[in-house]
Amino acid sequence: MDDSWPDPRTGVKSPNAYPYFDAEPDDGYDGDVRRRGRRRRWGRVLLALLVVLVLLAIGGYFYLDSRLKRESALDYPGRLADTPGTNWLVVGSDSRAGLSRQQRKDFATGKAAGRRTDSMMLLHTGAGGTTLVSLPRDSYVPIPGHGSNKLNAAFAFGGPKLLVRTVEQATGIRIDHYAEIGFGGFVGMVDAIGGVEMCIKEPMRDPKAGLNLKAGCQNLTGGQALGYVRTRASARADLDRVDRQRQFFGALIKKSSSPGVLLNPFRSIPLALNGTGNFLVDDGDHLLDLSRMMWSMRGVSGGDGVTTTVPIGGAGSSPAAGAYITWDRTKALQLFNALKSDKAVPKSVITK
């Protein structure tokens, strides 16, 4: 009886041809099969890892987006028609939420409840470039339903919605997005990235803001940074303060978006959690919008754009508002008309 089997590789019958009893040296056929099998397994593993990473990224985005606080700020009857480009109203409030009792004492924030505007900036991006304009809180402007008063009074009277309405009517520019952060969120963001380096020209001391800084370049902690952007203890008071606020926010955004922070999970994760947990945006805004805003501010701080304050015309006082400042109507109109038309801002209206 012929018990030989055809060799599947050569077709020649041989007693040892059956694969299970093949004693001949490996000629590479089985090795090729094993290598191809290993490659397929590694391919499936890499594909599975890629799918997991994509799902984590998507899940992380929606989780962080859900942490944003939201409030209707852009919905009121009779709004201005849309204007070209994209416009953000960026507000720093004096909300103490998120600060411990000891922090309130250390940072000299007081115990006031609620929130009031401590800084306001208009960020415009479009074909005419990117422009960041400080709106001093002591600006004397008409507030719908409340006569004329300081700009920050609009927030006190009616929150973000009335503030947006007041800014739109004072500038003629339609606001597309709103972002607000309080004291606690600001301190947390600065500390999450390990502080922000600033170069101080001369010593700064202001007990009312919990500030005591020496001259020179130094890394400011969250508490020191809060005092730095709050203090009005200088010759030009609020006008000096808005300059420092633009300067510091630019440095904060620049460091937050640097590879040293984004690629370091011990920095990027606390920053993302702290930022999204403390930012308040309009109920139509999302994390992607906020990321675009921060990227635009990063460009401005890097010199790719214009930073300025509304041209100031003078000062005054009234029983209702107390001391206030007024805008230079001619120059302010030129500034806002340029932004409203999405054109480059004339150099003659840029103030430093």
Where are these regions (language model features)?
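Non-catalytic, solvent-exposed segments at the cell envelope interface
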Residues: 2-352
